[in-house]
Amino acid sequence: MVDQLESEIIGIIKNRVESEGGDGETALIVGDLTAATELTALGVDSLGLADIIWDVEQAYGYQDRDEHGRGVVGSPERRRHSGSHPRLAH
């Protein structure tokens, strides 16, 4: 049985893969996506994985913190201040 969190994350992955415009075979796999589906079968490479992680962080408001409770480089809080996607930030 699929729980709500799993379902939401699968939805995030589907949205990302579909927005990247996968081929016809990928579209068939995306339609049957489960927690057991390997991301490589969807054509997700390391950069695509980083995008999926970014999407999940944004959806759930995840923030990396250091031992002093400050936002660390790469955290959503830090990215909000830079105003750009982490791949585009300098």
From Swiss-Prot:
Entries under InterPro entries matching the protein:
ACP-like_sf, PP-bd_ACP, Ppantetheine_attach_site
Sites of the modification O-(pantetheine 4'-phosphoryl)serine? 46
Concerning Gene3D superfamilies, the annotation shows: ACP-like (1.10.1200.10)
Would the keyword Cell wall biogenesis/degradation be found if you checked this record's keyword annotation? Answer: no
Q: Where is this region: Disordered?
A: 65-90
Q: Where is the composition biased (Basic residues)?
A: 78-90
Q: Which residues form the Carrier domain?
A: 4-89
Q: Does the keyword Mitochondrion apply?
A: no
Question: Which of UniProt's keywords are assigned here?
Answer: Nodulation, Phosphopantetheine, Phosphoprotein, Plasmid
Q: How is it modified after translation?
A: 4'-phosphopantetheine is transferred from CoA to a specific serine of apo-NodF.
Question: What is the purpose of this protein?
Answer: Proposed to synthesize nod factor fatty acyl chain. Involved in trans-2,trans-4,trans-6,cis-11-octadecatetraenoic acid biosynthesis.
For this entry, the protein name equals Nodulation protein F
Q: Which organism is it from?
A: Rhizobium meliloti
Lineage at the top is:
Bacteria, Pseudomonadati, Pseudomonadota, Alphaproteobacteria, Hyphomicrobiales
